[in-house]
């Protein structure tokens, strides 16, 4: 009897253990399966989902996110998920290709940047023996607490859209996290709004959004790394640069080796500090309590080593602004062009200004002015510049025809090229207008036209400004305030806005 009783007890224990295990398995199976790319996306996603999702990170610490290419196993992991969250196509350049290879109606792909407009990317050179990387657009938006808020909101909205029954959970979780981001944003604003030194020199050009949002200037340098000493030639030029602007710190993305730090200190007279681009955290660091907030607070502390000390205005080692695109060129380099350079169907950007599509562009330009202009003042300037009633232009360069669609009516004329004119502007830069004249004496307002597209030789235009009139080429050359602007008709308003920010 006693043996039967013990057997019964053991069976009950086994049944209970099975039930507990089964309940845990059901709970685990009920969780949303989420794959994220690298650390910031991982943390932002976990902050939104909380305990309702099983969130994993594809790109582990020690792997360079810029250079990562998914393996077959990685693709299978993504395919098996309910949600896949990444930062932006300019960061994870492989995502679109992977999307095409995955045949799953259950997987939802989330781009954290959503419809955010991004600044132009920069090519980053590494020390000898290391490859650099470049981006068409700068993806490092997560390094500005202000913009991180938008990333979290975009992730939240994507989860709410797919799992409306969990809306309250996602909104509550994200609200708590965004409150912390807003507090961090305030800390940055308070510490940097009255910075004594507005410029900081960095080896990793990842902090342009941070600089833009908090009134600073990021100055990237090349030919130095945290791991190896610069060449004698680079060290000599760096020493000269450091002394010229009395630079106290050069920032690296990781702690410089003691040898590199000693060389820079002894030879160039400059110290090293870390600005962490937050592209990865190790499991050990995460378990130790490191996260977005601890790293960004450390970054602020490091920045203040420079911003709290009054000094000379630091400028870049080389001036890369004096390019043809910015209006700096030699007369001998200017050549004639044919109408074929502007062939295509083009749309005016003016309607997008009127409907608000370009509003974020004005915000960017106002921030870039460092307080000299408000977004409304920038918009007013472009309103005058873009204003036109010619909504579309169709150019057939082979036939030398231009069709103007004005208030819905078409006006088509044949043109001949009559040369170019170099103009000098108040800022000291210059521009070239390419002049054409209609063969039809009844072309009226479109008798004389002038193209300007920031190019000085035969090049297929990506966009252009067009000037026109009925009096003379000389009279039109005087127009400097109104420059109707045209982009390919195939582009959306969002794409045009992105081009204008990066332009």
Predicted regions and their residues:
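Residues that flank catalytic or metal-binding motifs in active/ligand-binding sites
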Residues: 30, 196, 342, 389, ...
